[in-house]
């Protein structure tokens, strides 16, 4: 065992290590009676560096023992502090990645207890697949409902395109929780602000707004302005939406980031934004639209050291992600993502 180092009746063999949780469950059952559901959350895979953490075999045996003690359902999760990525799986991990474990537990328990699966169930299609394919009896969502608390309602109504996606970035949810500040969502600015801003307020005096740039910031700004009642025209130099988020989605295992721009583009379209692609914004072209307000959302530029700004063969990360050739001998400056 990785954490249980006891040498008494509660440590050592698996049977002894299961004694404490079994006693707790039996005590709870005695207190609440036979008709009260008891749910047990279990870390099914620890994957600790020493190799002696909980594994599938231990999980199945534990669930059998705890079921006998009086549990009605198991919430199958994974990880611990030393393997945090299993607790809150990031974008690079497959959706419902731990479904094989929940399926094994479900097969071992039969009808004696229900099995729930947690871990990167980021959308309703994945949740439905987990239940339909018999991988678990219930699919549990956490971060997906932070991204869009109306996910289930929209999915049931056939409005899947309106669901704000969760890409498991962990920026506003896990990141803020670690800092002990209120959680938010990097994609949904209303998340975490429901009490102070339950909906987007209408503008007192609607006007014409010109937005420059169809990246995530520009798309969200355009959609919000249109939802407030403004006439919105968005100018984009390229022939498509997405901006730099399209480049961020190029590396392996980052494909889900494309969901961000696709969702925001659809949101802006539904709000009534007029798009003008392959249209570079200039002071004159913007003035000709007679806007009441202009929002410039043209994104950031890479920081290029002066000593290599004009060097032959020098390219930026954006250039590489756009398809530029780096050559055979490459020097990389900077260790960020």
Label each residue range with its predicted role.
Residues 88-94, 198-206, 247-259, 316-323, ...:
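Short, contiguous acidic/charged loop-to-helix segments that flank catalytic cores in large enzymes
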